[in-house]
């Protein structure tokens, strides 16, 4: 099914979302080329479907289809007008009877603010290379420190930074502030780090810091 859905035609995206939901719900029309496909393993429930986006397009699609919406804060800029539009245009559906907004946040935690800040630079270098067509893995701290940063590159990093970094307390304050500012129902935390151990430690620190706050979903 993934091969059949693979297309760069943005205009077909709404149709593809509907096809995916039908597939998950077992309600694919007989005339569909996917009618003979069966989701396995099957069960009595269907997974939740969120529309992830950072522009009005995804928000409007989620609102029109009555689906939860996840705003990709680590990509976009000002989420307030987009989430407002989503809530105002939302049409209740069998899957979701009222607007449900999630904030997807890039965050990295360390025992101290200073260490966390240092850990943002490998991610910055990785993104810089990615924009230049280099898809190599996230570099190590040593590789990042050895990289000959130019003033222009440093300014680009500062201008496009979308990551929350700090000690557990700093992270907790920053995430709670983001949720409150946008009236989000939930937060999803994404951590990119030079190695698995650093990434796992970050998730553990964030989870412990947010143990008594609103629901936070951390996916390792």
Task: Please annotate each region the language model reported.
Residues 54-79, 83:
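A conserved active-site cap/scaffold subdomain adjacent to cofactor or substrate pockets
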Residues 48-52, 67-72, 99-106, 187-190:
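Hydrophobic faces of well-ordered beta-strands that scaffold small-molecule active sites
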Residues 1-5, 64-65:
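Acidic/polar active-site rim loop that often engages polyanionic ligands
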Residues 5-38, 78-184, 211-220:
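An alpha-helical appendage that flanks or caps ligand/catalytic pockets
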Residues 43-53, 159-168:
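Active-site mouth loops of central-metabolism enzymes
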Residues 73-75, 190-198:
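Glycine-rich, proline-tolerant flexible connector loops at the mouths of alpha/beta enzymes
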Residues 112, 197-205:
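Short glycine/threonine-rich loop-to-helix capping motif typified by GTGT followed
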Residues 31-49, 70:
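Substrate-access "cap/lid" subdomains that shape
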């Amino acid at each position: 099914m993934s091969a059949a859905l693979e297309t760069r035609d943005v205009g077909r995206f709404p149709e593809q979302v509907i096809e995916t939901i039908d597939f998950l719900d077992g309600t694919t029309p007989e005339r569909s080329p996917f009618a003979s496909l069966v989701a396995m393993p099957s069960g009595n429930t269907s997974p939740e479907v969120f529309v992830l986006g950072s522009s009005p397009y995804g928000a409007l699609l989620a609102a029109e289809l009555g689906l939860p919406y996840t705003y990709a804060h680590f990509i976009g800029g000002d989420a307030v007008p987009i989430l407002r539009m989503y809530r105002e245009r939302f049409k209740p559906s069998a899957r979701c009877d009222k607007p449900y907004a999630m904030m997807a946040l890039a965050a990295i935690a360390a025992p101290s603010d200073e260490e966390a800040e240092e850990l943002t630079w490998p991610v910055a270098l990785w993104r810089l290379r990615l924009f230049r067509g280099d898809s190599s893995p996230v570099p190590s701290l040593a590789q990042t420190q050895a990289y000959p940063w130019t003033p222009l590159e440093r300014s680009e990093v500062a201008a496009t930074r979308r990551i929350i970094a700090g000690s557990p307390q700093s992270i907790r304050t920053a995430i709670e502030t983001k949720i409150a500012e946008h009236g989000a129902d939930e937060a999803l935390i994404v951590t990119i780090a030079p190695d698995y151990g650093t990434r796992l430690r970050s998730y553990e620190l964030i989870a412990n810091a947010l143990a008594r706050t609103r629901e936070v979903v951390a996916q390792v």
